[in-house]
Each structure stands twice: as structure tokens, then as C-alpha cells.
Amino acid sequence: MSEQERVQECLRKEIRSLLISTKDGLTPQQLEKEYLLMVGNHLPLRILGYRSTMELVLDMPDVVTVSPCGDGTIILRAIPDESTKGIANLVAKQRSSHKVRNSMQKGRPSVCSGSSSRRRVPYRGRVPPILPAVVKSELKDLLALSPVLLSDFEKAFARRFGRSFQYVQYGFLSMFEVLNAASDVISVEQTRAGSLLMLKRSISEEKQRGWPAVTKGGKMFTQPFRMKQQGSYSTGSPVAKACFSQPTSNMEPPKQILNAEKTFKSNVVETSRLNHTEKLNQLENTFKSVISQIGPGGTINPELKHKLRFVVSKFPEGLLISKLLREFEIMFKEQLSPKQLGFLNVTELVGALSDILRVEFREGEQDLLVFDANMKPLASVQSDKKIDVKACVSSPPRNSLSTAAVKETAWDCLPKNHREPEQKICKKPNLVVKPLQLQVGVNKSELNLAMANHDIPPDAVRDKKLCRLPPLDTSTLVGVFVEYIISPSQFYIRIYSRDSSELLEDMMIEMRRCYSNQLVSDRYAMPEYFIQPGHLCCVRISEDKWWYRVIIHRVLGKQEVEVFYPDFGNIGTVQKSSLRFLKWCYTKLPAQAIPCSLAWVRPVEEHWTSRAIIQFQKLCGLKPLVGVVDEYVDGILNIFLCDTSSNEDVYFHHVLRTEGHAIVCRENVPSKGFRELNPLALYTKSSAGPEDVVLTELGCPSQQHYFNEDREISPQSKENELPTLDEIPIGMPCLESVTIGDDVWDENWLPLQAKMGKGGDAPSHLFTSSRGGKKPYLSCKEMPQKDWCFSAPKDMWDDSWQPSSLVNGMKVEVQKQEELSAQEKNIGTTRSQKQPNLESSSDSPTLPKLEEFYISLVESQQSAEGSQFEPSSIQTQVKQMQLSTAALSTTPAAVDSPEKHSGSVESSPESLKNDFSSSHAITVFKDKSHGAMDQLSLILSPEHQISQKLYIPRSTATAALGAAARLATSRRLLHWYPSVKRMEA
């Protein structure tokens, strides 16, 4: 037996002996004193893990029985066992003593009532104190994040507010009393882990009772009450209107309440027929109507409300809600704390004072504006800046209605004058309400009547479409999740990055926190007439308790609808009752699903076999993959997928070809499945611009992106177009990372293979470009005579293909001096022929399009005739150079045969060294839209800061994915060297 068990067993015997010796029992306070007098120590509550005496005795049901007394006190009596039954019988036969035990205060009667010669006022016990509003606000703030176990409450409170929860200073003796005092906002549920504290939700009895409302057909429906006691309400759960809905708009709610009370009191004959339960329900409804009319704003001191109104009235053009507390402090020299009033923040405080204040949101403003409710808005302000309903207070204004007069809110004003197309400004809370866009096939009068009987939240999405993600650049390396698979030619991916997947997770967490509140969920319930194909809403999946954005695809029947998940790509069936309006703030994030097809593959037969689909599903699994963007065909992304989780990288198209499920072709076949049905293109719209969502994770340097097949080439760009090599099929890119800096793995190797283009030339003067615009390059007149243009060779799928330009032991073709001189003359002739075009394009704001990227190296003023091409001297020079110059000097020169019309490179180590000393930067040109080009200036000088980005070369055909490919997730350190794709003129 452990020490704790021994102490507990001994304590059980001592408590039983104390209570058996007392005929009338003891209160918990008396038990503590009796135990202290008998044993000499206090009850060992902390040793046994208890917080109060009541918790201790409740854990001993076989020793102590708890019985409440008529005066409000609690009496503890012993339950005798076999050995103490005789003593209990003897004590029960004793005569009751009316003396006060243990020198209690004189004048206090005994615990139990008995025959007494003197009649005394019965003792009602200690009245539990009221929990202060600031404490209740802190408890709501703590439990709004997540429920907390009672055993972890102190740690959670200290972690949240930086101090322990001292309930004694508020007049409470235990947490049991605190929870009883906060029972209107906190509920306790018993779980296996212990007592779980959570924010109180609507009671099931309140769900069953509702205000009767008459629909068009005369049927009755119920709506759950959204009622809270004064000064206590859950976070983000606005108090709804508690008046009877009426078919006619001219009937006022106060008259209905008074009529209901009059009918309840006067019509005695009809009421007598009702049973007892119905009477209580009717009386309870009357009380709730009065309480809900008062609202949370009724708990605020009228003097404070007058001060707030005085402060706001000083700003007729509106006061920013973030400056309200400061202006109040400046004007009245006192601080205003919303938490002391029972509110979480100033927004919730202002929302509760809708009877004296109104809130507006204007386009272009980042904050809410507060106005005096009695002041008319300025006409100039209304004409210039429109108020938008969608960005109302996060906790919409609560109704602060008196019993004498109840004014209609903006929601009630919505159906009135609906025939007018222009916007109408309502009185409370003075929000501009746009007319509802009628659904096809819905009668306008029926819609108006239905809306009169249903509350549509002002920030609910009605006719908005989600935006799609902006297209990705070719050869972009991304981390992806394959979310939904139909076939290798028809599946959906989701990008794994800081700007996409993490934002989606944050939004889903916020949606779960918001819609899990029963009051909010009931308020945003979608009526039947809004359930139409194409409507954007949200739904909760009962299996995982998460809320998802969905788009209604089609209505299956009276109870079910088919919905499309724009963030994951799948289509599912849900109940109509589970659909909810989507809040406007949850539409900012674009749809995350991207329709894709596996690049360069097609099925062996006409359609994909089931074995091929199963094999593709096994390859994808539930793990992040690396994807390489190839191109877009009919708006469908064709992408290469690779699994880098094992030691050997696995390309999916290779596996499907090896297994005999697919044929690898060097073109992308349009997807038949997406051609028949593409819900994402049907229900979403393209991103309006990069200002909506910019995928900085993908390293897109340009502000605009156009596909090659969709691009139109202007005549000017055609004239400026430089001739390039014949198109060679681009192979799979190498995914080994290369760093430009001190941490290069091989200092004698640079991941750029220089190759002389046929007659091609590029500007050698370096320039920088910003995201906002691009500067024109210099004309060829200002260029040195000896500017060499290097182009990267394009990779091939053939594994036997080897680049002709190799370094560090690789093959280098050396030609005779005569051949070099002759080819050099040819290069000069070609350069002089192309010079007029370059001069004509120098005045254009953008560079001409290039089909390959060029590296310009500024050379020194040395003669080419005196230079000698010596491979041995080059190798010696490579070893002696610093990192910056070594990276440039070791750039291999791809020298092809003269039959291929490729120029050769002639230089010496001295000239190379001088060239690199004169310029330490490389400008990488990438083909962009309408002739515009981006450059990437790589500073290679040692005194400059080392680049922290990883640049991926396209040097070999079948290089495996290395460790750098696993960094393609959310580090922003992985970038492609710009790839080039031939465009049709």
C-alpha cells in the first residue's frame, strides 16, 4: 500500500468517527474545525489532490452522505459500516442538544431545526458572491480558444494571463463556487480525463422551443433562442432578435409581446386547458423576450454610454474604432477597459451599443468607423465612399431594444422597397444593403417574403466566386500534395508552401472556431431558396469535425446536395441542413486545388486501366511530393511528379512506363476527363492579378505571367528577336542544388555550360530591374568589341547524351589557330549584321524576347590575336582563382564543330582574369511576356554578400533528385535557372 493510499484510508476512518459522534451532522466548515481539534492538523487535501473539503467528501460516497438543509446549508452525515453500526444506533437514541457546538457565535441556531422554546430566524447560510465582469471576461477569453480540463485550469490561466487565478480574493471558497457563479457562460462536462470546462452552448430544451413564425404557406417553424443573461455571452455569439416574426412588416414587435402577455393573463379559460409544462414554457418565452431586448448593452452604465456618445459625436466624419479608447481617455482623463465591462475588445463593446452608435466600413479603409446613431451621414462621404456590408463588425451589432419601442434592424429593412435597384441606407445600424441577386426560377415576391422571415447575416457570401491560384512558371519546382485522383491524366494537387497550405490550415482552424459555436452555426444556416448550383458556402464533415469551403454542384433531392471542394478537388454528397453561409472574410484565400495531368504520358490503351490508377494512387500516397511544372494545356497543369522520401528518387512516369501502364511521349495529351467536366474552371474565376495572391514561395520574379501558347508577339518583338539554335527537346531538369557562395561543393565547377549561339549576341552591359518596371538596355554602340554570348545547352531524354562542354577532366575540343581566326571573323560579321536591329530596339522600354538565356561577361581591352587557348593553363588558373572568379572562369565553353555553325571560344587565362576583375556579375535573362525580360544579377565578388538562394542548373538529363529537392517546400531557398521554351512566331 502506498503512502497516499494509507493516508486516505486513515482519513476515511477519522471522518466517519467524527460524523458518527454527531447526531445532527456537521457542515463542511465544522468538519474542518472538528478535525483540527481532534487530530491537530488540517485535512490533508493537497496531499490527496483535492482542492476543497466538498471535493473530498464527494469522493467518499461510502463514508459521507451529503444532504442539503431547508435553510440553504449543506449537512454531512456519516454512513456507518459493520463495525460502527452499534455506535451509530446509540448516538441516534440521544436527546438532541440545542447548544451551539464548538463555541460557535452566540445567537446562531443549531444546524438542524428542532423543538425550541424560542423562535429564531432560520440561518440561510453564506450567499455566494457574484463573479466580477472582468473575471468572467477573462474566463471567456481563456475558454474561447479551446476547452480546458479542471486539473489544468490554473496552468492554462497562468500561461494566458501571467498570473494565478486567486478566486479567494473575489470572495469564493473553492473553484466549485466559481463554476456555479459562472454557470451561465461555462459548462462542465465529465470525461475520462476529468472535468472539462468549456463555453456554454445552447441547451437542448432551448432548441426545442422557439418563436413561432408564419411562412408563406402558413406553416410554423421554430428558431432557437439566442439569449444570454445580462453581462454574460459567448465570444462571437451575437444575441439575435427575440421578437415574434410577422408576415406583415407594419406590425411592431412590442405590440406582439404585449398582446402575448395580455392573452396569457386574460384568457384564463384557454390557459386552464394547457398542462403545467406548457404554462412554464409560455412564461419562460415572455421572460426571454424581455431579457433579449435589453441585450448586453443594457449592462453598461448609462453615464458611460452618454460619455461614449459624446466622444463619438465630436467626429461627424467618423472615428476610427482603434482610436476610440484613446480619445475617451484624452477627453475625460480616465481609462476605459472593455474587459472590466465584460467585453473581449472594443469592437464587441461598440457592437453591443447599437442603440447609440453605428459602425461603417468604407472601401480603402483598414479600420471600422464609429458614428453617432442619431447623426445623419454626410452626403459627400456617401457619394465618394460606399459602405460595404460584408466587412461589418466581426461580432455583428446586438439589438439593444427597450420594452416600450423596438426598432427594426438592417436585416428587417432588407426586403422593404426591394424593387428599387439603388442602394438603400437603413436606420440601424445604417449599413448600405445591396439588393439581392435573384436566383433563376425563383419568384421575386416569394423571395422577398422568405427573406422577411429569415435573418441573412450581412457578411454572408451570396453571389461571389473564388479566385484560382495564378499559373506557375515553366520548370518551377514545388512541393505538392496529391489530394484527389481520378486517373494519371485527371487529378488535383495542393501546393505545400508557407503562402498556400499554411494559410489554408489557418483559415480552417478559424472556421472551426467560428462555426463550432452553436449560435453562429444556427445564424448562418442556409435557407432552401439559396441552395442553388454554383453557390459558395461551407459545410462541416461529421467524421473529422472540420469545416470546408464548398460549391454546390447539383441538387440531388429534398435532403441532399452534391458539392465540390475547391481546396481539395473532390466532389461529395452532404445534407442540405449541414450547409452554412460562408463568411466574406473566408473568400480572400484562392481555391487551393489545381487540376493536373501527369506530363509526357498517355495510357497504353484508349483509357487508363484500373491497375494503372491503383498504381498511381500507391505512388502518390499521403505524403509530400516534388513536382516540376511543364506547361498548361487547356488550363490544365501538366506536371512531373517525383517521390524523394526514399534513398532513390522515383519519377512516376518512369514507374508507369516500367510497369507497362503508360507510354512516355514527348508531348502532353489534353485530358479527356477535364474536358468533359472541370468544376474548378466552372465555378471559380481566374486571379485578377498578382496583387490578389502572390506566390512568393514559388520564386516568381515577374508581376505578370503568360503562357507561351497564349502569347501574342508584337511586330516590334519579332524584329528584335535574335536567332537561336534549333530547338532541342528539353529533358528532365537536374534537381541537385547549387549555391553561389562560399559553400559551393566543388569550387572548380559552375553549373552553367557556355555555348556559343550561331550568330547570336547579347548586350553585355549589366543592369538591374525592379518588380515595378524594367529599364532599357544599352545600344550596341556602347558595347565593347569583344562580348561573348553564352547559352545553356538544352537537355535531352536520351541517357547516352553527354554535354559537349565539359570541365575538370572532361572533353574540350581544341581547334587550330587558323580555324579560330576564321570563325572569329565570321562571328564579327554576324555581329555587325545584327547591330542595326539592336540599335533600333535600344529605345524600347522592354528587352526583346530571347529563346535562351544569356550570360554576358565584360572583357578587357586586350587583343584577341595575342591570346592563346591552352587547356593546361586554364586548369592551373582555375585552381589559383578565388571563389568568385573561379566560378566564372570555370564556366565551360561548349565548342561544337563548324558544321553546326557554332562559334568557338578563344581566350587566355590572363584575359579571363582581367575580364573577371572588371566585372563580377552575371545577368541571367529569362523569357517573359510580350518581349519583357527579367534578369537575375548574381554578385560573385567576395566582398559582396553571399547569396542564400539555391539555383538549380539544367545541365544533365537524368540526374536524380538530391537533398536540395527536399527543400522545395517552405524555405524560399530553391529556385530554377530560367528555362527556355521555343515560341511560335
Curated annotation (Swiss-Prot):
Top-rank taxon: Eukaryota
Bias type Low complexity, positions: 107-116
InterPro entries the UniProt entry points to: LOTUS-like, OST-HTH/LOTUS_dom, SNase_OB-fold_sf, TDRD5_LOTUS_2, Tudor, Tudor_domain_containing
Biased composition (Polar residues): 823-845, 904-915
GO cellular component assignments: chromatoid body; pi-body
Record GO biological process: P granule organization; spermatid development; transposable element silencing by piRNA-mediated DNA methylation
Keyword set, alphabetical order: Cytoplasm, Developmental protein, Differentiation, Phosphoprotein, Repeat, Spermatogenesis
Sequence ranges assigned to domain Tudor in this UniProt record: 530-589
Phosphoserine: modified positions: 897
Boundaries of every HTH OST-type domain copy: 7-80, 127-202, 300-374
Cytoplasm listed as a keyword: yes
Annotated stretches, region: Disordered: 98-119, 818-846, 889-915
Subcellular location per the Swiss-Prot or TrEMBL entry: Cytoplasm
Biological role: Required during spermiogenesis to participate in the repression transposable elements and prevent their mobilization, which is essential for the germline integrity. Probably acts via the piRNA metabolic process, which mediates the repression of transposable elements during meiosis by forming complexes composed of piRNAs and Piwi proteins and govern the methylation and subsequent repression of transposons. Required for chromatoid body (CB) assembly.
Family: Belongs to the TDRD5 family.
Protein name as it appears in the record: Tudor domain-containing protein 5
Organism, scientific name: Canis lupus familiaris (Dog)
